């Protein structure tokens, strides 16, 4: 089979190498999945480039650990073979999910993974759509509903609104009749307005932490500013929720959050993702035409190195999706 291997950190177009390798064999409670579609995510960028540097403490200081040699954390595909203890699926089942709690490896034609990493794919969504949902949609839902405790008619800002999480977060916020401002690069603003944002800002031209607008809830997909700046634009009892970003800013929040509780009624949170939680609920919204998948692509399997670089450059509109075995 073909798979993308990485041995050293670096430029995705250089270090992601397409190789021929043996098809893996499922052990115990693993299943072998024929990968039909995968996506590009923040972990894929970090595993490939070693950036932000703090992620090297997780993935390997000088090079990715051997088990991370094949990146890829979201998958939609077909069960091809069962390990001896696998009981949740049968051969031929269509499955999908965020596999990051159990490992990586979806930048390949076949993937072996613990059966608990996946769920049955609904019949009414394509493999490409299914691959785009698990990580981004659950992050958006957990960030807004579970952590941010969104309420009707709130004023919300999404920093990084033009990406995969941002596009799902917009749609979920609109279910609560929220007024939603999106922040991203100027090249994405027209598409973001078409998706339904009430207001869009080019972060290169306007610093939303210095204008007169204030917000009940901020969902931060970038975490690229100081907490003190967000404090200025949060309304009393407002909530700031980070889903990831620059390691220095994330560490700042971990250390400062207890201090902020002492003198402010504004709340600062980080999402600790529960992978694949509420996929059935998210599918019900999709089925009722309440949300849709904003797909950047799909691109062909040979475009993965280019697509990882596209993600890192922040040029994607929605979720970058790769067709593997169409």
PLM ranges: what are they?
Residues 131-202:
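Mid-domain Rossmann-like dinucleotide-binding core that forms the NAD(H)/NADP(H) cofactor-binding site
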Residues 224-288, 324-326:
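Glycine-rich phosphate-binding loop and adjacent beta-alpha segment
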Residues 274-326:
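C-terminal hydrophobic helical "lid"/dimerization subdomain
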Residues 210-217:
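A short acidic, Gly/Pro-enriched loop at the edge of an enzyme's catalytic core
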Residues 94, 155, 238-239:
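Short glycine-centered segments of the SAM/dcSAM-binding site in methyltransferase folds
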Residues 102-115:
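A structural motif shared across PLP-dependent enzymes of the aminotransferase-like
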Residues 22-39, 53-102:
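Glycine-rich beta-strand-centered segment in the early N-terminal region that forms part
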């Amino acid at each position: 089979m073909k798979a993308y291997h990485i041995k050293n950190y670096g430029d995705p177009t250089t270090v992601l190498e397409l190789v021929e390798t043996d098809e893996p064999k499922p052990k115990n409670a693993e299943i072998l999945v024929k990968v039909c579609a995968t996506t590009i995510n923040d972990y894929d960028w970090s595993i490939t480039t070693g950036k932000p540097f703090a992620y090297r403490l997780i993935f390997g200081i000088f090079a990715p650990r051997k088990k991370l040699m094949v990146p890829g954390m979201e998958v939609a595909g077909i069960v091809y073979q069962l390990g001896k203890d696998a009981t949740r699926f049968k051969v031929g089942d269509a499955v999908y999910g965020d596999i990051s709690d159990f490992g990586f490896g979806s930048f390949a034609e076949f993937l072996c993974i613990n059966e608990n990493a996946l769920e049955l794919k609904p019949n009414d969504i394509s493999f490409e759509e299914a691959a785009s949902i698990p990580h981004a949609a659950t992050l958006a839902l957990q960030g807004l509903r579970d952590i941010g405790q969104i309420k009707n008619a709130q004023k919300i800002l999404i920093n990084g609104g033009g990406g995969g999480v941002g596009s799902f977060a917009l749609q979920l916020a609109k279910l609560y009749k929220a007024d939603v401002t999106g922040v991203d690069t100027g090249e994405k603003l027209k598409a973001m307005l078409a998706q339904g944002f009430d207001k869009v800002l080019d972060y290169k031209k306007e610093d939303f932490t210095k204008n007169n607008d204030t917000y009940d809830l901020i969902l931060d997909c970038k975490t690229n500013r100081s907490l003190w700046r967000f404090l200025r634009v949060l309304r009393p009892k407002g909530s700031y929720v980070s889903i990831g970003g620059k390691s220095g800013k994330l560490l700042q929040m971990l250390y400062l959050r207890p201090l902020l509780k002492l003198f402010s009624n504004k709340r600062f949170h980080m999402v600790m993702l529960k992978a694949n939680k509420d996929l059935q609920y998210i599918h019900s919204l999709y089925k009722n035409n309440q949300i849709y998948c904003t797909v950047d692509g799909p691109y062909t399997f040979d475009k993965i190195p280019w697509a990882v670089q596209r993600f890192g450059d922040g040029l994607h509109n929605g979720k970058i999706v790769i067709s593997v075995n169409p």
